[in-house]
Amino acid sequence: MRKLHKVALAAVAVEAAAASVWAYVKWVRPWQMTWGATPEEVSREYPYDDAFEHPEWNATRAVTVAARPEQIWPFLIQIGWGRAGWYGYDSVDNGGRPSTWEVLPEHQWLEVGKDFPMSPFTAVYCGDFEELRWMLWRTGGDAGTWLWYLDPIDDTHTRLITRMRDHYKWTNPLILPQQILTELGDLPFMRKCLLGVKARAERLARVEAQQAAAGG
């Protein structure tokens, strides 16, 4: 009897796990992959989308920033561990060092091949860019792309869009744990980073507007 009870509990656990996975794939993952982005932004083609086809990871997130591209761009090109930070959860993604609210002149140069540290041991690099418009990051093996894209709405507002695309195999036991962690942890960190860029760029825009008003 006790053995049958254990079997029944195991069956219930398996069913619950399967239901959770189904709910995640059906409802949570589509929202996670498109947080803040409009249907048009999700379906739009961006630079280097043709780097590879049918990626397993294809996430497009966006936020509206009350600032011009030139007020947002400086905060993007200085991102990185030990640099400006990730404007997110500093205790986790910047070694406990607070992300800066300022534009750092020493990190305002950008060129193809420039590294952006993810941690003390890993980094992505700039694969290509168009000044004040977009910046593409690549991994060392060129397996994935990470695009930052600035789309002006009007004279004082810009859509900040990020698109991440990657290939991986769910059947690979060596990669699966990392991908599960990425699936569950990426959105909170990406959302926090986008909102961090937004807050800093809008602060800069307010300061510049006040200075212009005082000077005028």
Predicted regions and their residues:
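Beta-strand/loop substructures that line and gate deep hydrophobic ligand-binding cavities in soluble
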Residues: 35, 42, 139-199
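Short, hydrophobic/aromatic-rich segments at coil-to-beta transitions
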Residues: 107-110, 128-137
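Short, surface-exposed coil-to-beta transition loops
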Residues: 58-60, 121-122, 142-148
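Membrane-penetrating hydrophobic segments
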Residues: 1-12
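Short, highly charged C-terminal tails/helix-capping segments
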Residues: 98, 196-216
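A short, structured loop/turn motif at beta-sheet edges
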Residues: 66-70, 128-132, 149-159, 199-206
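Hydrophobic ligand-binding cavity/cleft-lining segments
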Residues: 16-109, 123, 215-216
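Short, charged/polar surface micro-motifs in flexible loops or helix N-caps
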Residues: 81-82, 129-133, 143
